[in-house]
């Protein structure tokens, strides 16, 4: 790792800051780009793939940049996190969940616990086995397929729901029957994190993979949040995007793109921060000798790039979808697969 130059640190920091939050896999790009450039850059990936230490020095450096990315997330969503943390502490004191902010706090906890446990147990194994150029290219292609499939499933579900509603309106009048009212999930009319008011009642979703009804973030069930958290563990595979996989899971459970992206970014904050903090002791010890300046430079660039990326993506997902990112992952993954398969 002593061969890491300031140029390499800056480029990798920029790459990390952008791709960590775009649904295109930061780890996959951190493996593929150096391998494509070759030379001393290729050596970084070769060193990573050797797996003969407790952790690859290169991946230790990359994960160390996560602290800067997490700080960017905390700064951008500072008002959200202030509300969520206050709400969480209030529930610990009162032992009741009464507001949308309090519910969101526990949804984040429910989604973070699974990835925390599995990540601690399997991170080293997964990254030693799969953080290689060909594997990263294959998983990047798979990431594109997941994003595209999620968008198509969501669109078909909405179309079916619209067809059923139109058919119901067109049906002739019938003898009225007394039937039970649909179950509702009561929620208080409060401002959710971000300042948006929540609905007073939301129809409870039916079972199944895809929920066709549009739902607000704070109406997710805790088990649904836990499943979304389990989806995050796929991001241990270089090429699978954490933000992409959690957004797809949110879309399938009825969230719109804006709420799915917001929940994804909120979930990413504690996970990315914890991953970075776990690696900081290694960088502060002998393993960091000769590269601490490079880490600082990379972290500064990663933090700035991450903040700008969040700002762009929050606005982007107000009106747009994951489809362009899916196409990018499919094309890039396929080209890289061919490149490294014949190398």
Curated annotation (Swiss-Prot):
Q: Which domain of life is it from?
A: Bacteria
> Positions of the region Disordered?
179-202
List, as start-end ranges, the regions of compositional bias called Low complexity: 179-193
Listed transmembrane segments: 21-41, 57-77, 104-124, 129-149, 225-245, 265-285, 294-314, 322-342
Q: What is its main location?
A: membrane
The record's section on InterPro entries has: UppP
What GO biological process terms are annotated to this protein in UniProt? Answer: cell wall organization; peptidoglycan biosynthetic process; regulation of cell shape; response to antibiotic
| Compartmental location | Cell membrane
Q: Which GO terms describe its cellular component?
A: plasma membrane
Q: What is its EC number?
A: 3.6.1.27
Q: Which UniProt keywords apply?
A: Antibiotic resistance, Cell membrane, Cell shape, Cell wall biogenesis/degradation, Hydrolase, Membrane, Peptidoglycan synthesis, Transmembrane, Transmembrane helix
Report how it sits in the membrane.
Answer: Multi-pass membrane protein
Q: Which reaction does it catalyse?
A: di-trans,octa-cis-undecaprenyl diphosphate + H2O = di-trans,octa-cis-undecaprenyl phosphate + phosphate + H(+)
Q: Which GO terms describe its molecular function?
A: undecaprenyl-diphosphatase activity
Q: Which NCBIfam families match?
A: PRK00281.3-1
Per the entry, what this protein does is: Catalyzes the dephosphorylation of undecaprenyl diphosphate (UPP). Confers resistance to bacitracin.
Further information in the entry reads: Bacitracin is thought to be involved in the inhibition of peptidoglycan synthesis by sequestering undecaprenyl diphosphate, thereby reducing the pool of lipid carrier available.
Give the family from UniProt. Belongs to the UppP family.
* The name this protein goes by in its record: Undecaprenyl-diphosphatase 2
């Amino acid at each position: 790792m002593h061969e890491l130059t300031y140029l390499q640190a800056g480029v990798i920091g920029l790459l990390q800051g952008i791709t960590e939050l775009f649904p295109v896999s930061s780890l996959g790009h951190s493996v593929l780009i150096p391998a494509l450039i070759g030379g001393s850059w290729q050596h970084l990936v070769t060193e990573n793939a050797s797996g003969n230490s407790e952790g690859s020095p290169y991946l230790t450096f990359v994960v160390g940049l996560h602290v800067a990315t997490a700080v960017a997330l905390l700064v951008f969503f500072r008002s959200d996190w202030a509300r969520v943390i206050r709400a969480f502490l209030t529930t610990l004191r009162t032992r009741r969940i009464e507001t949308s902010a309090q519910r969101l706090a526990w949804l984040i906890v429910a989604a973070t616990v699974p990835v925390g446990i599995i990540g601690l147990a399997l991170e080293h194994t997964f990254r030693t086995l799969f953080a290689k150029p060909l594997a990263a290219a294959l998983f990047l292609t798979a990431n594109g397929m997941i994003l595209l499939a999620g968008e198509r499933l969501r669109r078909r579900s909405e179309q079916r729901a619209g067809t059923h509603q139109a058919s119901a309106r067109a049906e002739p009048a019938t003898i009225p029957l007394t039937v039970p009212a649909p179950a509702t999930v009561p929620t208080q009319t409060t401002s959710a994190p971000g300042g948006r008011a929540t609905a007073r009642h939301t129809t409870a979703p039916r079972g199944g993979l895809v929920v066709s009804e549009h739902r607000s973030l704070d109406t997710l069930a805790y088990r649904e949040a836990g499943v979304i958290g389990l989806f995050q563990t796929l991001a241990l595979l270089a090429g699978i995007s954490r933000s992409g996989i959690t957004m797809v899971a949110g879309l399938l459970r009825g969230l719109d793109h804006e709420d799915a992206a917001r929940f994804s970014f909120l979930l990413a904050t504690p996970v990315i921060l914890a991953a970075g903090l776990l690696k900081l002791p290694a960088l502060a010890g002998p393993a960091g000798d000769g590269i601490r300046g490079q880490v600082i430079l990379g972290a500064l660039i990663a933090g700035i790039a991450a903040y700008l990326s969040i700002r762009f993506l929050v606005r982007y997902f107000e009106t747009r979808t994951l489809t362009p990112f899916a196409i990018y992952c499919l094309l890039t993954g396929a080209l890289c697969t061919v490149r490294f398969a014949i190398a």
